[in-house]
């Protein structure tokens, strides 16, 4: 996967809404309801940032690729190819009473792990993980503001992004990639391109100031992030495959 479709652009100020703007609370002649505690943050929800690149806004969504997700993908794929990569061999030996029996020969687990890694291809596993993360994400043009709405039913995610420049309606997903933070967590990244025509709705001198979610992932160079994330993911995959190979060989 190539991460270089976006140069190092400036971050900018936008307006972000957590829910539909056309919901109006009606007055009711009943006692006031008790205050409820705030909803617990959904850890599946993505971090996001917005950048301006030439004549487009680029919205970046980041979601963590957990070891659990990688393990599920690896085990599924390994089940499909196991009988092709592992073909047991037997040696005919005689016991102390002269009886001939077949004994399964030992297997080089490291060699088998390397062969499986090559057949599964770490890149394909990363791509599948990112597809799963953003599988039900939906993009639509806002009817109330100059912006777009990004939502996900699975992640209970709803964000409305409104912009100062008048946008075109041909926004699209322009690519996916990976990134890594300083704690060696890896993230799937989805980029959404929102073109604008250059006409501003208002004179805003703060267009290049930062405005992102409070949990924004540390900003590093995109290509460096992807390379680092790939290396971490490859190490995680190899560890998972080794454990699964050992389990299958010793538990067969």
From Swiss-Prot:
Main subcellular location: nucleus
Keyword terms, alphabetized: Nucleus, Transcription, Transcription regulation
GO molecular function: protein-folding chaperone binding
UniProt entry tagged with the keyword Transcription regulation: yes
Domain of life: Eukaryota
Keyword Zinc set for record: no
GO BP term, pick one: intracellular protein transport
Location within or outside the cell: Nucleus
Any one GO CC term of the record: nucleus
Function: Involved in the curing of prion [URE3]. Nuclear localization of this protein may suggest a role in transcription regulation, so it might exert an effect on [URE3] through known prion-curing chaperones or BTN2.
UniProt-recorded name of the protein: Curing of [URE3] protein 1
Protein species of origin: Saccharomyces cerevisiae (strain ATCC 204508 / S288c) (Baker's yeast)
